[in-house]
Each structure stands twice: as C-alpha cells, then as structure tokens.
Amino acid sequence: MEKDLANLTTLCYIEKDGCYLMMHRVSKKQDPNAGKWIGVGGHFQEGESPEECLLRDVKEETGLALTSWRFRGIVTFVSDEWGCEYMHLFTADGFEGELPEARMAACPEGELKWVEKEKVPDLNLWEGDRIFLRLLLEREDFFSLKLSYRGAELTEAKIF
C-alpha cells in the first residue's frame, strides 16, 4: 500500500442534472469533518499527480470512473489544530458507472447524496467551503484561496 501524504488532498464536486454529489461525513471516528457535508476526494499517495489522486479517490469512494473533469483551484488551509493542507479542487461533469442506493449509504467515508446546487448552502458546511463553492459557481477561471482557521472558526480568507 502506498503512503498517504497528509497535507496534499483533492476534492471534487461531481455534477449531474443541476446537482452536486455531496458526502455527509458521518462514518469515521476522529474525523475533523465529522457531521459536515463535503465533496468527494482524499489524500495523495506518494508519487501521484493531482489527477491520479482524483481519479483513484472518486473510484474508491463512489465506484464512478470520471471521464470529464476540470482543475478549478488550489485551496490552502492553515489551522492551529490540523496544520496546513493544500487541497486541489476539481469539478466533474462526466462519469461512467452508477451509484446504487446501497453504495450511497455504504461509502466508508460517509453517506453520499445528490443535492441540488441551490440547496447546498443550506447544508452543514465549513465556512471556507461556502467561499470556494460560491467561486466554483461564479467564476470560470482558476483560483487560489487561502483559508485560516482557529479551531472550527474561519479567521481569514484570501482570494488570489
């Protein structure tokens, strides 16, 4: 098994029929994202490119094979509790495979659900996630975003 790189991650918002595939993080113990809704993704393994990590993690968590995706931005998280993380943010609008109900509820990371894009802000999200989700909807260009947290509180957000 390859070594996970703790501070390099991917996150993908898979789109279908005006919805994003969201994950409700309710399955893992000791999860900094416990109870939050996020996209699909995970940690790089040693030697992986962002795209290789994206494709592997989406397949592992959902069973879907992405066929069309865009690298949308880099999000730098700085936290007094969890250190620093560099997240490679993607959207995807093409995939092969199906998500049966059993897979939606049985993902080891949490529960998967298709959520209408306009209803995503009503979910229990990190404050910083609200910022980059808005950027994904409003901008077409690549962006860099730095989010600083003290505990669970967002203390600073800078868009570059």
What are these model-predicted stretches?
Residues F44-T67, F77-L136, E156-F160:
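Unchanged
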Residues L21-M22, I38, T155:
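General beta-strand recognition
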Residues M1-L21, F44:
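Conserved N-terminal beta-strand and adjoining loop/helix that marks the start
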Residues L136-F160:
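Charged phosphate-binding loop/patch that engages nucleotide di/tri-phosphates or the phosphate backbone
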